[in-house]
């Protein structure tokens, strides 16, 4: 039986970790390499770094963060944000990341998924999907540019297409739930999980240990659950979440 993964997410801006609530207000949560080390010691299975720097300087700083993190971490980590070309992927992976995550760039140019998958293997390519439920469409729709622009893709169709093109994993964020701490979007996660053959990481909405249980248990069956603020501000710890899951019979490392 495959163990379920708990993944802290670190949003990095100009070399510092920050966390927004519903993609807007930002608080400073510290040094990325120190935090990564802390989470490794806490028993995190993986980490995700999302580079939200807009500047070229910020992007260069991110390469340094990746190199330093790779030198101190034993667990795998993924880097996303600003990856638009195969060369961008090469730089991040050569700096020491295990996987790259693409979002807006993949929707703008879907062949990017295939290029990365052909060159590095599907296991290195994560497609991140930001989805919001639309009453008008009666389903979850995909948004780009940090949740600002609505696309014509439903989350289910885009996840299927991303996998067809070579994505090895889907990182699925519910924009409705993001930062709310009221639980993951179980309907969205289950729908995408059932539509694709690759692992799905649920993101957006974790507030308590039981929220991880809800999304990882058999009913929804996400492969991994990601959270940021509840870990950064020490509202709960990776170790506590895993202890809770073990007690509930969920297989964790």
Swiss-Prot record:
Subcellular localization(s) per the UniProt record = Cytoplasm
Q: In which pathway does it act?
A: Amino-acid biosynthesis; L-histidine biosynthesis; L-histidine from 5-phospho-alpha-D-ribose 1-diphosphate: step 5/9
Task: Write the record's keywords in alphabetical order, separated by commas.
Answer: Amino-acid biosynthesis, Cytoplasm, Histidine biosynthesis, Lyase
Q: Which GO terms describe its biological process?
A: L-histidine biosynthetic process
Q: Per its record, what are the GO molecular function terms?
A: imidazoleglycerol-phosphate synthase activity; lyase activity
Q: Is Hydrolase among the key words of this record?
A: no
Q: Quote the catalytic activity from the record.
A: 5-[(5-phospho-1-deoxy-D-ribulos-1-ylimino)methylamino]-1-(5-phospho-beta-D-ribosyl)imidazole-4-carboxamide + L-glutamine = D-erythro-1-(imidazol-4-yl)glycerol 3-phosphate + 5-amino-1-(5-phospho-beta-D-ribosyl)imidazole-4-carboxamide + L-glutamate + H(+)
Q: Name one Pfam family in it.
A: His_biosynth
The record's InterPro entries line, in alphabetical order, gives: Aldolase_TIM (IPR013785), His_biosynth (IPR006062), HisF (IPR004651), IGPS_HisA/HisF (IPR050064), RibuloseP-bd_barrel (IPR011060)
Which Enzyme Commission numbers does its entry carry? 4.3.2.10
| Gene Ontology CC terms | cytoplasm
Going by the record, the broad EC class of this enzyme is lyase
Q: Where is the signal peptide?
A: none
Task: Report the active site residues.
Answer: 11, 130
In this UniProt entry, which cysteines form S-S bonds?
Answer: none
Which superkingdom does the taxonomy of this entry point to?
Bacteria
Question: What function does the entry list?
Answer: IGPS catalyzes the conversion of PRFAR and glutamine to IGP, AICAR and glutamate. The HisF subunit catalyzes the cyclization activity that produces IGP and AICAR from PRFAR using the ammonia provided by the HisH subunit.
Q: Subunit arrangement?
A: Heterodimer of HisH and HisF.
Q: Which family does it belong to?
A: Belongs to the HisA/HisF family.
Q: What is this protein called?
A: Imidazole glycerol phosphate synthase subunit HisF
